[in-house]
Amino acid sequence: MLNSFKLSLQYILPKLWLTRLAGWGASKRAGWLTKLVIDLFVKYYKVDMTETQKPDTASYRTFNDFFVRPLRDDVRPLNTDPNILVMPADGVISQLGRIEEDKILQAKGHNYSLEALLAGNYLMADKFRNGTFVTTYLSPRDYHRVHMPCNGILREMIYVPGELFSVNHLTAQNVPNLFARNERVICLFDTEFGPMAQILVGATIVGSIETVWAGTITPPREGIIKRWTWPAGENEDSVALLKGQEMGRFKLGSTVINLFAPGKVDLIESLANLSVTKIGQPLATSTEAFVAPEVEPVPLPEEEIKAEHDASPLVDDKKDET
């Protein structure tokens, strides 16, 4: 009954207006009120402020400033092995595995279309059929900047307007083609591991999606697909990003989907649904390495794993299924 009510709200509530209201409020400087909201948020979601460059909540002028807070340089060590791709975001893996022709796993028993995710771009989809995907959910407590898993040359960016459904276990199980329906920004890179797509997916109250090379992509929400391209290689107009470098951010955030070409990478064996991710830790290895490195994600303290799972609707909504 409770789940049915929650699901009904996804279709009834004015998600766009709620998102605009959240974005407006999060960008306002409200002095003591801003600090109070941040303090309550930190307490409720158990945000670890000791990892941030500015642990004093009074130092943030707006809630958005707090939400995209930078971390200290020493808290996310980067695995520098050239054969290793690293996690692009702090969060929880919601799904990962092989792309079966045009099908990507959304939730148990539910798939969505690769081509639909890529806004009907069948040429781009052909690069990833039978490849590998990873879907990472960023909970409210997480660091909301997104980084590069490997070195990459930006070739294409597509803004796809769409719905603003919440992204959690309940909607993944009940909203068909959830990620292919929600607003998103698709970024295609040339890498040493073949083509890679990194997709930033919006959701309810995601006020803004930004990239480091173009700034704010959305809003405004004009309801049309937009496409930009960049040259390859050493061209002076090309955009080159290094492994571990920031590539984008959410202001009130959501989900990152990575797509890799077939036969190019192997995911770290210990990773699974609901694995906690930290930027810079091993995500995958190259299939073309001369010596396969033996790598595992750095073990996290049990209390940190519990806090991450407790903050994630991917876990919380399962409690309501009975």
From Swiss-Prot:
Binds 1 pyruvoyl group covalently per subunit. Its EC number is 4.1.1.65. Residues 294-322 are annotated as: Disordered. It is found in: Cell membrane. Is synthesized initially as an inactive proenzyme. Formation of the active enzyme involves a self-maturation process in which the active site pyruvoyl group is generated from an internal serine residue via an autocatalytic post-translational modification. Two non-identical subunits are generated from the proenzyme in this reaction, and the pyruvate is formed at the N-terminus of the alpha chain, which is derived from the carboxyl end of the proenzyme. One of its GO terms (cellular component) is plasma membrane. Signal peptide: none annotated. Its cofactor is pyruvate. It catalyses: a 1,2-diacyl-sn-glycero-3-phospho-L-serine + H(+) = a 1,2-diacyl-sn-glycero-3-phosphoethanolamine + CO2. The record marks G253, S254 as: Cleavage (non-hydrolytic). Keywords: Cell membrane, Decarboxylase, Lipid biosynthesis, Lipid metabolism, Lyase, Membrane, Phospholipid biosynthesis, Phospholipid metabolism, Pyruvate, Zymogen. One of its GO terms (molecular function) is phosphatidylserine decarboxylase activity. It holds the Pfam family PS_Dcarbxylase. The modification Pyruvic acid (Ser) is found at S254. Pathway: Phospholipid metabolism; phosphatidylethanolamine biosynthesis; phosphatidylethanolamine from CDP-diacylglycerol: step 2/2. It is a peripheral membrane protein. InterPro entries: PS_Dcarbxylase, PSD-B, PSD_type1_pro. The active site is at D90 (charge relay system), H147 (charge relay system), S254 (charge relay system), S254 (schiff-base intermediate with substrate). The keyword Zinc-finger does not apply. Residues 303-322 have a biased composition (Basic and acidic residues). Belongs to the phosphatidylserine decarboxylase family. PSD-B subfamily. Prokaryotic type I sub-subfamily. NCBIfam families: PS_decarb. Catalyzes the formation of phosphatidylethanolamine (PtdEtn) from phosphatidylserine (PtdSer). Heterodimer of a large membrane-associated beta subunit and a small pyruvoyl-containing alpha subunit. This is Phosphatidylserine decarboxylase proenzyme. It comes from Salmonella arizonae (strain ATCC BAA-731 / CDC346-86 / RSK2980).
